[in-house]
């Protein structure tokens, strides 16, 4: 399942982060006032690791060791910038992450939460996806898409958030879909499907990296040797086991079941329309806290997810996931009328209007209809603008 792959992806990225931390420490080891930007979650994680991993043997004596620890703690907690409450929040957050199971800790750290509340929301989202993959994510996607449409200027890039799958390709520098493609189910990423893989040799480096992902619970299919075939029965059995989690909380409206009552309560808001989480900046409301957190990045401009190929950054990992298809050339969405393929499902839906004749965009001045919104914008220029009196 997609969420299983993402959990194990988090562990892999945690290991990659450790390597990156070491590289950046070596690069900026000239002193405490390094070239690192100290105002982002990734840098705070680097300083935290420096503080926690400092060894007594690295200093010539006890006084120097204590002084170095004080410097490292200062770099991490930044008392000249943070209030006592903020410092306490960082310490509680660190301890909260420490007590989590290893695989969950890696998953949460991947999202770089800045508070305990945000870390809890990440975990609740994970539980929700295990309960009902896709539904809540698509709900967030719809809310974000509507907001972006309202606020975006003409020509602004749109970030799709209809998928929570984070690819490893930008970390490994390797087209994993060519080695072991992802099975798409109803337009959503599913499990690695080795049966779709070409019969060619896979490098030992890539093979070992992918196999690391499967060591937690084995839900990722074993990477085959050259010419091997997938054990279909074994894969189906693993899928049956993963779907056998008890879900005692049942929605009286639609019959869907959930593992926790809190997730059922949030689900019921899709029926009632309740949106208790409101943005302080623009007043927009959301049914879930995670939707509000994602939305707030539009105001702050925070973009945590960066493409290692071209450097472009995104506020959500789904935006990076779709962007990577530009580099890989992947076009998984195919028109059943003309067989033309597209990298995004939304583009396929717009393309299909050519075949169906649907023209949803109407000019209020003359009543002419258009397939694409951009065509309507262009058409409006033919109408004279009424001068204000």
From Swiss-Prot:
A zinc finger (C2H2-type) spans 249-271, 277-299, 305-327, 333-355, 361-383. GO terms for cellular component: nucleus. One of its GO terms (biological process) is regulation of transcription by RNA polymerase II. It comes from Homo sapiens (Human). Its main location: nucleus. InterPro entries: SCAN_dom, SCAN_sf, Znf_C2H2_sf, Znf_C2H2_type. Belongs to the krueppel C2H2-type zinc-finger protein family. Keywords: DNA-binding, Metal-binding, Nucleus, Repeat, Transcription, Transcription regulation, Zinc, Zinc-finger. It is found in: Nucleus. GO terms for molecular function: DNA-binding transcription factor activity, RNA polymerase II-specific; RNA polymerase II cis-regulatory region sequence-specific DNA binding; sequence-specific double-stranded DNA binding; zinc ion binding. The keyword Metal-binding applies. Residues 48-130 form the SCAN box domain. May be involved in transcriptional regulation. The keyword Chaperone does not apply. SMART domains: SCAN (SM00431), ZnF_C2H2 (SM00355). It comes from the Eukaryota. This is Zinc finger and SCAN domain-containing protein 23.
């Amino acid at each position: 399942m997609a969420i299983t792959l993402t959990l194990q992806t988090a562990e892999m990225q945690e290991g990659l982060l450790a390597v990156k931390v070491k590289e950046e420490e070596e690069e900026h080891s000239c002193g405490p006032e390094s070239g690192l930007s100290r105002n982002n979650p990734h840098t705070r994680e680097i300083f935290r690791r420096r503080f926690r991993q400092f060894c007594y043997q690295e200093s010539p004596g006890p006084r120097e060791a204590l002084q170095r620890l004080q410097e490292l703690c200062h770099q991490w907690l930044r008392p000249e910038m943070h209030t006592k409450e903020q410092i306490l929040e960082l310490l509680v957050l660190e301890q909260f992450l420490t007590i989590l199971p290893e695989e969950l800790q890696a998953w949460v750290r991947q999202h770089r939460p800045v508070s305990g509340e945000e870390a809890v929301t990440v975990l609740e989202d994970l539980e929700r996806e295990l309960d009902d993959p896709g539904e809540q994510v698509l709900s967030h996607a719809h809310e974000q898409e509507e907001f972006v449409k309202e606020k975006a200027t003409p020509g602004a890039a749109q970030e799709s958030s209809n998928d929570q799958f984070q690819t490893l390709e930008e970390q490994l520098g390797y087209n994993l879909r060519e080695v072991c493609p992802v099975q798409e189910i109803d337009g959503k990423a599913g499990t690695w499907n080795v049966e779709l893989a070409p019969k060619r040799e896979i490098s030992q480096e890539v093979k070992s990296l992918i196999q690391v992902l499967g060591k937690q619970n084995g839900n990722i299919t074993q990477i085959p040797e050259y010419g091997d075939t997938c054990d279909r029965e074994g894969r189906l059995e693993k899928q049956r086991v993963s779907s056998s989690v008890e879900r005692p909380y049942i929605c009286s409206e639609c019959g869907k079941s959930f593992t926790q009552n809190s997730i059922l309560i949030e689900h019921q808001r899709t029926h009632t329309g309740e949106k208790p989480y409101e943005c302080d900046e623009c007043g927009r409301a959301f049914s879930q806290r995670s939707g509000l957190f994602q939305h707030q990045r539009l105001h702050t401009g925070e973009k945590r997810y960066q493409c290692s190929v071209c450097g472009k950054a995104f506020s959500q990992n789904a935006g990076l996931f779709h962007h990577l298809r530009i580099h890989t050339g992947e076009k998984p969405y195919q028109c059943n009328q003309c067989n033309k393929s597209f990298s995004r499902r939304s583009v396929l839906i717009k393309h299909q209007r050519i075949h169906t004749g649907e023209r949803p965009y109407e000019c209020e001045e003359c009543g002419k209809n258009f397939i694409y919104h951009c065509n309507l914008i262009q058409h409006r220029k033919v109408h004279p603008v009424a001068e204000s009196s």
